[in-house]
């Protein structure tokens, strides 16, 4: 997926910001959330989030659902490196497993499993 945040900010700028955030808020996770291509959902009002590391993916789903004003019956999928993360995974664990070199975690959201995403399995 092409990330607008990456296109708008070069690697050095993103890395410096990611590093600054992680030093200042070591118990929080810097997350970039963008709509997947072909998704019919609304755009978020902001892309960048700073979330507690003990927040679960399920709780983050709830937060994003509210921000895009989804009805309870509307589907919402997250993708991290083309994988659908489990809802009980903490954002800290997801970050540890999937953050990029710029120290941000990138999450795409969609109203359908557009990537044919696989559910992440716990070992």
Swiss-Prot record:
Site (described: Required for the interaction with unc-51): 25, 50, 104
InterPro entries: Atg8-like, Ubiquitin-like_domsf
Keyword Membrane appears in the UniProt entry: yes
CDD domains given in the database record: Ubl_ATG8_GABARAP_like (cd16127)
Record annotation: effect of changing residue 3 to G: Does not rescue the protein aggregate degradation defect in the lgg-1 bp500 mutant
Residues the record marks as site: Cleavage: 116-117
Tissue expr: Expressed in PLML touch receptor neuron and in the ventral nerve cord. Expressed in AIY interneurons.
Induction remark: Induced in response to a moderate, short-term heat stess, also known as a hormetic heat stess.
Effect on the protein of changing residue 102 to A: Defective degradation of sepa-1-containing protein aggregates in embryos
Pfam families: ATG8
Protein's name in the database: Protein lgg-1
Gene name, Swiss-Prot/TrEMBL: lgg-1
């Amino acid at each position: 997926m092409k990330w607008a945040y990456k296109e708008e900010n070069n690697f050095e700028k993103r890395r410096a910001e990611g590093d600054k955030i992680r030093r200042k808020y070591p118990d929080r996770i810097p997350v970039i959330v963008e709509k997947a291509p072909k998704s019919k959902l609304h755009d978020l009002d902001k892309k960048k989030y700073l979330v507690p590391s003990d927040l679960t993916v399920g709780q983050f789903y709830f937060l994003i659902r509210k921000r895009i004003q989804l009805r309870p019956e509307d589907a919402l999928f997250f993708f991290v490196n083309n994988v659908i993360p489990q809802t009980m995974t903490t954002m800290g664990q997801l970050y540890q497993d999937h953050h990029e070199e710029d120290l941000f975690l990138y999450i795409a959201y969609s109203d359908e499993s557009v990537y044919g995403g696989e559910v992440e399995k716990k070992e």
